[in-house]
């Protein structure tokens, strides 16, 4: 581990030199690349330097064990014990930091929420989840922007797509991808029976232009008049935009803005994120196939969480987390779930790293 840490520290120094080079500073793409790598290594280097400093202090304190004064020798023993505990803690921190990280963790994210089985009740719950993530983003100090939405007559969402802008947004929200099941009594249910509905959530890392090149000739652009609930026209100009990526068949529609240009820019951002996600999923599937292990393949087909209103319960089925604070969670209090899932998947990554 320590040979690797020395290499990381050496590379960190090289990057600091490169980022101070005027030729790199004037090359936007190169500077961004080096800056990202520098940021990824910063925490590791900081922990390693603290580890070395503590080790040096232990050695200095050991010299005091030979002191003639018994009181100084006793103080030295206590100090060494404290420093060893600190070094052990830093050792664990370094092991975690050296575990392979998701390169997308610090990126902005695109969140797609779609009503599934359950009709109108599913669309209402899609709106509940949208509000939940929106409020969580507010508590984290992140900015949000709706890219596209399809509203039902009752105020629910058939589909809503929005961006979340903020450092660490992807690392906090990426485990939300999957099927979210809700169990509750609809307001229109006279018999008081509990209905089960489902909503799908997809969380995609924002793709930067330098990461993913899209040939303009491979995109088909269609424009049309935007429509609201029930199909009524909400604009008299052809402001809605539909982009089709011909090689993959991925289609994106944006019609929320009155400006065709704004809709096209939003659609391109969504398209780029979906294509990057598709590329990542393909890579994960190849890795999983090579290992003969589907863990981490990115399969979203399974139910990941249940929201049970009669019991006031939220259960995440992957990590086995159950919380009896449903209303609080739906108001954006996701920290306990997010932290629990991060710990669970970190342990899974450590298992995979040890096995490889």
Swiss-Prot record:
Location of this chain's protein in the cell: Cytoplasm
Gene field: prfA
Stretches for region Disordered: 286-307
Top-level taxon of origin: Bacteria
UniProt-listed NCBIfam families: prfA, PRK00591.1
InterPro entries: PCRF (IPR005139), Pep_chain_release_fac_I (IPR000352), Pep_chain_release_fac_I_sf (IPR045853), Prokaryotic/Mito_RF (IPR050057), RF-1 (IPR004373)
Protein name as annotated: Peptide chain release factor 1
Family annotation (Gene3D superfamilies): 3.30.160.20, 3.30.70.1660, 6.10.140.1950
SUPFAM superfamilies, per the entry: Release factor
Listed GO CC annotations: cytoplasm
Function: Peptide chain release factor 1 directs the termination of translation in response to the peptide chain termination codons UAG and UAA.
UniProt entry keywords in alphabetical sequence: Cytoplasm, Methylation, Protein biosynthesis
PTM section of the record: Methylated by PrmC. Methylation increases the termination efficiency of RF1.
Residues recorded with modification N5-methylglutamine: 232
Family matches, as Pfam families: PCRF, RF-1
Family, per entry: Belongs to the prokaryotic/mitochondrial release factor family.
GO molecular function annotation: translation release factor activity, codon specific
